[in-house]
Amino acid sequence: NSVGKPSLSDLDGPTQVRGYSTAPRGTGYPSMVVTAQTWNQELAYEYGQSFGNDMKAVGVVGLWGFACDLHIDPFFGRNNESPSEDPFLAGTVMAKAVSGVNTRGRYTFLKHFAVYNAYCERTYMSEQTLRETNLKAFRKAFVDGGSLGAMTSYQSVGAENSNYSEALITGVLRKEWQFKGAVTTDAISGADYQFEGLVRCGGNFGMNVALGAAPTMKDKIKYSESETTGRMQNRMRDAVHQILYTWLHADYNERYYQANGKESGSYISSTSINSWVWWKPFLISLDVVAGCALVYWMICATLNFVKLEKEENA
């Protein structure tokens, strides 16, 4: 009430708004795999816009989706929610779909950040592999697509749960990718969840499934200012600021789109600066030199052919 923020509704549904809830529901779309198989970025963008229209129609502001997980395990039961096993294709499709939703003043909690592709015996990989696969797909969706929300996943990153992994949420997402939005958990199903760890490490709130429902969980989560440390109070202020930013920036995205028209479809993104690599200018220079040499050879060959023709006819 102090800042005038209205009560907002965030709901699930990877291919249908309110797909797991009672009616009214949005349109039931094909799976994201089908969208990726078209290799059509404009279609993915329009998919997001149509999804955003459905969200507005049924009164949903935030979507617990889209999924940007990679198809590492073919037996994983949720592969249909995410586009592909290829990080570039998955990231490109997600970036366009998220951008489309943004034009409708809605926001997405891109999930599951990160490495969620099995129910048990989760994936083991090095940091380099992580950055070249799963994080590569998410980076395109966050940086190029401008997703305003993120949903964590339930597995360990090293020896820490990914929900309160400071290296992943604060280090990669917020510092490296300059993400300013809100981070939520996946569905909470137990009373031993370390909500304070989530907030301390860059998260914002837990999905309201079991949060605070069990007495033991109520005892562990401290809402009283007198019982909370100064560091936690400061972090809570940052968390609230990020939640408000998500809501207000979604509204800004829609207003900007309406003011600038359809041609501004690529504006909704963070600032992405491609790192300089030596081989790009080298290859361009090599192409130019090879092209000039080919043109020179063709001119010389033509002149020589004309000269020989004249000598034969003389």
Which residue ranges define each predicted feature?
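Glycoside hydrolase catalytic-domain context in secreted enzymes
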Residues: 1-314
